[in-house]
């Protein structure tokens, strides 16, 4: 057991200690505010306070974990053996920065509560983040810091028992649009033909007609292909279904469509499933609950997983709404505009509500890469995608974290927009499962 001296306790401190020491370092710990108890303890220990006591491992504590509410944070930057860090303290200390405050700042998404600009979809922009501006968005620094600090502890206390986590890969698939042409209903189909005529898009008219006449496979119907790939590479997969009312940014097949319901049920036979809360659910109250109830009815079982359509998160409101409808796990934590680690971590963690100063029961699973990021935001050629994924994957494997990818059924269609992305996905499964 590891004993930690603290000069003061707080909900924030307990939260980050449980995550950082308990989960990431795999070490059981207790805290004490009694200096004499700490000095007389002969076992493994370190000091997290404002003053060093003897010659123990010492981390200077900044104010963040003992504050309440949101305040502008002033911190210095440093590097720790080449790894970027902030809340810098002094090079003479065992660790030259307050790694617990820095970790809490990132994982709690403290900066997303501060004043910031939002994008056209009312999302926090990655360019506002400290990870982006300081150049460590592509590194799971919280995991790296935990691994390095664990080495310091074990070097002094080699007999201290600790657990080691194992690397894991999870593929997640968003079904925003189950089919390109099928099951759209008469009015939507007529409207689509009209738009194609106005745009002189003859190839799409021909393709749509062939699919509707069953002379050609619907290009977005890639479900058998995905099943074969996931089975071949022994992949854990989660499908998220968009069941929102039709709107400008919510254009899936109607939830009343029996073939769509059958598709959902068939995918749920061999994979985990979750709700993909619609764009509209972030605007109109009550929609989220309705969508969860619809999926529950189709699956005939409790729905506990979610990922926001368009990755729309507004803290703490979005997560509070999920908790209110009994969602237990969310997979939205990532950026649309860039790849990497939005919360600086590649392991799951509980959402800490900074407004209420409480650890919630909602588990956050951060993802690292999304197909649409490469295609629409980074605008890279398909040949470059795997080379951008590999370094992130290596970072996650090095710290025994969890690598989560976000793909869509339509990006495996090999249509003109997604040409080359089918082979990219298979290569991703191959290297991520190795």
Predicted regions and their residues:
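Metal-dependent polysaccharide deacetylase catalytic core of the NodB/CE4 family, i.e.
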Residues: 177, 181, 202-204, 224-313
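Catalytic domains of cell-wall/extracellular-matrix polysaccharide-remodeling enzymes
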Residues: 13, 281-358, 416-418
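Short acidic/histidine-rich active-site segments
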Residues: 274-276, 332-334, 406-408
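Glycine-centered flexibility motif
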Residues: 270-274, 338-342, 401
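Terminal accessory/targeting
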Residues: 1-255, 347, 354, 358-434
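Conserved hydrophobic/aromatic pocket- or pore-lining residues that grip, position, or stack substrates
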Residues: 174, 276, 322
């Amino acid at each position: 057991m590891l004993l930690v001296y603290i000069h003061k306790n707080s909900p924030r401190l307990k939260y980050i200690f449980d995550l950082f020491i308990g989960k990431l370092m795999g070490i059981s710990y207790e805290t004490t505010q009694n200096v004499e108890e700490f000095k007389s303890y002969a076992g493994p220990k370190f000091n997290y306070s404002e003053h060093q006591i003897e010659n123990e491992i010492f981390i200077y504590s900044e104010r963040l974990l003992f504050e309440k509410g949101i305040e502008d944070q002033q911190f210095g930057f440093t590097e720790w053996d080449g790894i970027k860090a902030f809340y810098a303290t002094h090079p003479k200390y065992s660790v030259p920065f307050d790694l617990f405050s820095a970790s809490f700042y990132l994982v709690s998404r403290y900066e997303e509560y501060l004043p910031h600009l939002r994008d056209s979809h009312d999302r926090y922009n990655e360019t506002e983040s400290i990870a982006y501006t300081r150049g460590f968005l592509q590194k799971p620094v919280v995991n790296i810091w935990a691994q390095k600090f664990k080495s310091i502890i074990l070097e002094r206390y080699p007999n201290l028992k600790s657990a080691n986590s194992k690397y894991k890969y999870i593929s997640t698939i968003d079904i925003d649009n189950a089919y390109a042409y099928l099951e759209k209903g008469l009015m939507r189909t007529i409207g689509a033909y009209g738009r194609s005529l106005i745009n002189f898009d003859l190839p799409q008219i021909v393709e749509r007609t062939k699919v509707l006449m069953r002379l050609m496979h619907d290009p977005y119907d890639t479900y058998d292909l995905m099943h074969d790939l996931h089975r071949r590479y022994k992949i854990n997969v989660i499908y998220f279904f968009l069941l929102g009312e039709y709107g400008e940014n919510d254009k899936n097949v109607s939830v009343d469509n029996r073939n769509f319901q059958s598709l959902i049920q068939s995918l749920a036979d061999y994979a985990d499933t979750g709700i993909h809360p619609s764009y509209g659910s972030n605007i109109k109250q009550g929609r989220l609950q309705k969508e969860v109830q619809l999926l529950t009815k189709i699956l005939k079982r409790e729905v506990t997983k979610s990922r926001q359509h368009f990755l729309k998160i507004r803290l703490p409101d979005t997560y509070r709404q999920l908790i209110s409808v009994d969602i237990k796990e969310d997979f939205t934590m990532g950026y649309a505009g860039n790849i990497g680690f939005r919360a600086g971590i590649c392991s799951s963690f509980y959402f800490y509500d900074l407004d209420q100063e409480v650890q919630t029961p909602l588990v956050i699973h951060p993802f690292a890469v999304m197909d649409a990021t490469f295609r629409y935001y980074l605008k890279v050629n398909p040949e470059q995608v795997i080379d951008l994924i590999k370094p992130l994957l290596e970072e996650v494997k090095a710290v025994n974290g969890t690598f989560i990818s976000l793909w869509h059924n339509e990006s495996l269609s090999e249509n003109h927009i997604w040409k080359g992305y089918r082979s990219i996905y298979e290569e991703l499964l191959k290297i991520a499962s190795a």
